[in-house]
Amino acid sequence: MAKISVAAAALLVLMALGHATAFRATVTTTVVEEENQEECREQMQRQQMLSHCRMYMRQQMEESPYQTMPRRGMEPHMSECCEQLEGMDESCRCEGLRMMMMRMQQEEMQPRGEQMRRMMRLAENIPSRCNLSPMRCPMGGSIAGF
């Protein structure tokens, strides 16, 4: 009986240590993610909140989704957008585009349904158009209202 009690106590200690380790890993991960988000916010500010990417997106959203030829004056915003993204760490580019999308949704536009899906597809593929890594930035459930 004493052997069972000792074994049970040892098992409880191991479980408690495992829980403490998992908790520490969660806290460490959360702190690292918060520090990374802060670094990305600073990079966004240095890159003017991706203002040219927003202008490019705005122009794209004003055009028909079936238009095949780009409008005159649109490509400079695209190349400036690429320069702004290139000025950010690779690890912050997608987070920066997500921040830009949330800002556009909250401050400038109120896209819904298909318009929101189109806007997200455009933003997801901006790195690819710029030939930057990562080539695609999934927006998925990270944007409110989608």
Curated annotation (Swiss-Prot):
Pfam families: Tryp_alpha_amyl (PF00234). Residues 23-36, 65-69, 143-146 form a propeptide. Disulfide bonds join C40-C92, C53-C81, C82-C130, C94-C137. It comes from the Eukaryota. The modification Pyrrolidone carboxylic acid is found at Q37. GO terms for molecular function: nutrient reservoir activity. Keywords: Allergen, Disulfide bond, Pyrrolidone carboxylic acid, Seed storage protein, Signal, Storage protein. Residues 1-22 form the signal peptide. SMART domains: AAI. The mature protein consists of a small and a large chain linked by disulfide bonds. Belongs to the 2S seed storage albumins family. This is a 2S seed storage protein. This is 2S sulfur-rich seed storage protein 1. It comes from Bertholletia excelsa. The gene is BE2S1.
